[in-house]
Amino acid sequence: MNRIARRFLGSTLGLILLAGPAMAQPKADPDWPCVQRKVATLSPGQFWTGPDIAAAGDWGSDNDAAVLAQKIASRRTDLSQVGPLLDDFSSKFGSDKDAKDKALTRVYAGVFEVINGERDKVVGGIARYSQGQRRMAERIRDEADKISQTKDAPSATDATELPKDQSELETKFAWDRRIFQERSQSLTYVCEVPQLLEQRLGEIARMIQAKL
């Protein structure tokens, strides 16, 4: 076997390990590659101890609440801006505490729906990403097997140059391996996103409840 092939094949075990915990260890969901525990979706009550959400009315029917909810739910809005935005919104109700509390509850309902919807999409995307990585890992293993088979080929011992088809296979193997590793590194960050969104939702819920 030539030196290039040996080097690549010697790193195959490391490649498999890079596939992520879900590919190396049994999981409840084989398509979940993250070390973080999978929570498929969230519920409003996880973060809210304020007034009844249903009794406050449909947040989408309250234009002011909907605009604010979408603004503060967006990750483009820094959390340091949320408090002042809530203060401005609350000031519109003067001394009418009941109206203010219901409006703020609608704001929370909107924030929850926006962030949870974004989070659901991320979780679904991670599953599809994991499936793609698994398929690529299988393809790379197949390529490695084909390269290793040349070791026993009749012409392998005396050959001074790689046959064209073998050279192309090793080039493809190296390229696929590089792509796989880069995607594995990206997955580490992507896996953090659902938890970051949960944290943002929890912090905004706390800020809203502090204004009640």
List the predicted regions and their residue ranges.
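Bacterial N-terminal signal peptides
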Residues: G10-G20
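Alpha-helical oligomerization segments
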Residues: A156-L212
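Bacterial N-terminal signal peptides that target proteins for export
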Residues: M1-S11
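Extended, amphipathic alpha-helical coiled-coil scaffold segments used for oligomerization/tethering
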Residues: K102-A109, E113, R134-R177, Q181
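Short, charge-rich amphipathic alpha-helices with coiled-coil/heptad character
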Residues: G94-I126
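N-terminal Sec/ER secretory leader and immediately downstream segment
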Residues: A24-D101
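Surface-exposed polar/charged interaction patches
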Residues: R75, K92-D96, V114-G117, G132, ...
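Long amphipathic alpha-helices with heptad-repeat character
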Residues: L79, I126-Y129, Q133-E143, I147, ...
